[in-house]
Amino acid sequence: MRAFHGRTYGSLSATFNKKYREGFEPLLPGVSHVSYNNIEALEKAVNEETAAVILEVVQGEGGVYPASAEYIQAARRICDERGALLIVDEIQTGFGRTGKMFAVQHYNVTPDLLTCAKSLAGGVPMGAVLIGPNVKNLTPGVHGSTFGGNPLSCAAANAALDVMREEDLPGQAAAKGAYLVEKLKKIESPNIREIRGLGLMVGVEMKQKVTGYI
């Protein structure tokens, strides 16, 4: 629930919010949405016919909800037991924002596929899918893209990755995120329901609509 994975046909099918889906149906059949951080619901939803479980380790569009370690580790176990792939969507969380290069590293879990984009090339449009050894049938030439491997985007990505490593942007995000949360908690406002997040990906949930605060 609350998942947002994109606006193209496949990713939109896995996106929960109806406002994005309306006008584009029918979408891909066989997609089920499961309550986030609910291991029991995930156990019931995944079976031997399930191709993959796709999730965000921190739901961004859904309200900055981090997954529990138990949930992510259970997802890995369930996928292994039932022959499904574990796909982690790191479009928003990847490349240091949460205090590690990839948010899934906080959970000591290795996904089968990891999607990344946005900050990958420092704002220049670029996306990538990282695959592990369980994805055996995806070989060079199986998938193609008109704009794939764009030289400008690749050069921008190389430069951005150099800066991330040389300036330790993940470490900076961890330190600054901890500082931000510490200061936010000191506000102690009766209007704040919850402060949550991971690294520098932090959300403040208010008890009323936020229109009046922005």
Please describe what each predicted stretch is.
Residues 1-214:
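Conserved N-terminal phosphate-binding loop of PLP-dependent enzymes in the Aspartate aminotransferase
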